[in-house]
From Swiss-Prot:
UniProt function note: Plant non-specific lipid-transfer proteins transfer phospholipids as well as galactolipids across membranes. May play a role in wax or cutin deposition in the cell walls of expanding epidermal cells and certain secretory tissues.
UniProt-recorded name of the protein: Non-specific lipid-transfer protein 6
Keywords from the UniProt entry: Disulfide bond, Lipid-binding, Signal, Transport
Signal peptide, first to last residue: 1-25
GO MF terms held by the record: lipid binding
Any GO BP annotation: lipid transport
Keyword Signal in annotation: yes
């Protein structure tokens, strides 16, 4: 548990650095990290995502309702994916579908977030 909290804090700080220069009103990495922190077990190879994880995914999708918000969320996810040791890339890419939502990009360190549109 302590390791997970430490990782979440590192991800949060990294997300803040990435998003700080973006336009005001864009979704924050803090919100993304908070919404998706229950997904950490699944993203590192655990069994299917928990109901709390899927609830966070759905909450994030609902909050990201403009192009700048979706691009900001994408950048946060991209940064977080790069900072999670032992990230299971297949689980990361499958997460939205496992939670019954559709996002227009893969959760990956190679995603070009500038192409994400609402």
């Amino acid at each position: 548990m302590a390791r997970g909290m430490k990782l979440a804090c590192v991800v949060l700080v990294m997300c803040m650095v990435v998003i700080a220069p973006m336009a005001e009103g864009a979704i924050s990495c803090g919100a993304v990290t908070s919404d998706l922190s229950p997904c950490l077990t699944y993203l590192t190879g655990g069994p299917g995502p928990s109901p709390q994880c899927c609830g966070g995914v759905k909450k994030l999708l609902a909050a990201a309702n403009t192009t700048p918000d979706r691009q900001a969320a994408c950048n946060c996810l991209k940064s977080a994916a790069g900072s999670i040791t032992k990230l299971n890339t297949n689980n990361a890419a499958a997460l939205p579908g496992k939670c019954g939502v559709d996002i227009p990009y893969k959760i990956s360190t190679s995603t070009n977030c500038n192409t994400v549109k609402f």
